[in-house]
């Protein structure tokens, strides 16, 4: 098979509805827009959320909370994700980013204790849960808490 021979699966592509092209087509005359009124006009219709003049839901409900601009956001990973490294490797957030264990480092990396760790590693510059520290040290590794 060549690139120019590729075809969509049978029945997966529907022909577009061509409206306003004569009464014989079944979609002539009013082109599926009914009779007169706001929705029959060009550009007709109401904006999203408009409820006919009634106070809309998004304005009836009160505002709640705020965004703390000082909040620290951490990317969390589990200890079993660290098994891709060799024994004795020094792991930092930069190394995790480089090896694509994490896609971005926001305000840091937090390592959680889900799963098992089989490698002895030195982990620096991260935050840890208690269970993660226990598992890293049980595997013969070291933890340097920030």
UniProtKB/Swiss-Prot annotation:
Residue ranges with Gly residues bias: 21-31, 42-52
Annotated region (Disordered), positions in chain: 1-54
Residue pairs linked by disulfide bridges in the UniProt entry: none
Annotated signal peptide: none
Biological process according to GO: translation
UniProt entry keywords in alphabetical sequence: Ribonucleoprotein, Ribosomal protein, RNA-binding, rRNA-binding
UniProt-recorded Gene Ontology molecular function terms: rRNA binding; structural constituent of ribosome
SUPFAM superfamilies in the cross-refs: Ribosomal proteins L15p and L18e
Ribonucleoprotein keyword on record: yes
One GO term describing the cellular component: cytosolic large ribosomal subunit
Subunit structure: Part of the 50S ribosomal subunit.
NCBIfam families referenced in this protein's UniProt entry, alphabetically: rplO_bact
Chain's role: Binds to the 23S rRNA.
Family (UniProt): Belongs to the universal ribosomal protein uL15 family.
Protein name: Large ribosomal subunit protein uL15
Organism: Clostridium botulinum (strain Eklund 17B / Type B)
Lineage: Bacteria, Bacillati, Bacillota, Clostridia, Eubacteriales
């Amino acid at each position: 098979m060549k690139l120019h021979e590729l075809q969509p699966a049978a029945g997966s592509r529907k022909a577009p509805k061509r409206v306003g092209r004569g009464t014989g087509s079944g979609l002539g005359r009013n082109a599926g827009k009914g009779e007169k009124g706001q929705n029959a006009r060009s550009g007709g219709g109401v904006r999203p959320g408009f409820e006919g003049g009634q106070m809309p839901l998004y304005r009836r409900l009160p505002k709640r909370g705020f965004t703390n601009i000082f909040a620290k956001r951490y990317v969390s990973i589990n200890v079993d994700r660290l098994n891709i490294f060799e024994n004795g490797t020094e792991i930092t957030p930069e190394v995790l980013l480089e090896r694509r264990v994490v896609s971005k480092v926001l305000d840091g990396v937090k390592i959680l204790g889900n799963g098992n760790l089989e490698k002895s590693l030195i982990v620096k510059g991260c935050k840890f849960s208690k269970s993660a520290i226990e598992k890293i040290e049980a595997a013969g590794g070291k933890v340097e808490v920030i």
